[in-house]
Amino acid sequence: QATRLMMLIDGKIREVNLNEKIIYETIVPDVAKFSMYGSELAFVKKLNADKKFVISIFKLRDMGEIKIDEVDESVGINQIFVNLTEFYGEKYLNTVIGQSLRVYSTDDYPNHDNENTSLNLALEKTLEAVPSEFYTSANGEFFMGVSGNKVMLVNLELMELLQFEHNNNTIRQLDYYLMFDVVDGKMQVYDFDHDNQRTILEKVADGFDAVINHNNRYLYYVGTNDSGLQIKRDKLF
């Protein structure tokens, strides 16, 4: 909810109520990093006594976490990523350990109320490089990562991994199937597979997101003029 969020505070996932300015009790302790989608959390716990990072998931209000995998300490925490999403009624868990990528699918994540649910390995690939970041796209349809100028993208509809070179690591999502970048003040748009490049706008400021409104009629972005920066709107059709 907009007034309640999850934060990692001193290695503890805690719920924060922004309206009442309350930080609730710890939900999960000893966490190094986490991601969230809906009411589910996926996280990597700090090194345990066995020198392992533990990847787990947790459904809010459940009795406890469910362990998914263990990772040896030889793999640094900055090379481990976990992400969740839901697409067309199917739920997905993505793990990246070094260059090893896995995508699991399920009708419902395992939890203590229904331990019969299971994760199905839908995709397993070796990445061409260790990513510096890996995340769920804004529309929940892709898992995306970057390593220098290399972009890695998991298309959940086709359940395939795409890897391609871009001229920088600032390419990002514009809408469901489009990605964009700003090069020399021009907004360049690409299909999700990096094909069909075209320039759609000029005098665009770099370093800012751009969004298309809900009915796909207007594009909002940060432009430049003689006075500096300005929020602009362009009609798409």
Per-segment meaning from a language model:
Residues 1-2, 13:
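N-terminal "mature head" segments of proteins
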Residues 3-4, 90-92, 141-142, 177-178:
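Structural hallmark of WD40 beta-propellers
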Residues 8-27, 50-75, 98-128, 146-165, ...:
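Surface-exposed loop/turn elements that mediate protein-protein interactions on large endomembrane-trafficking
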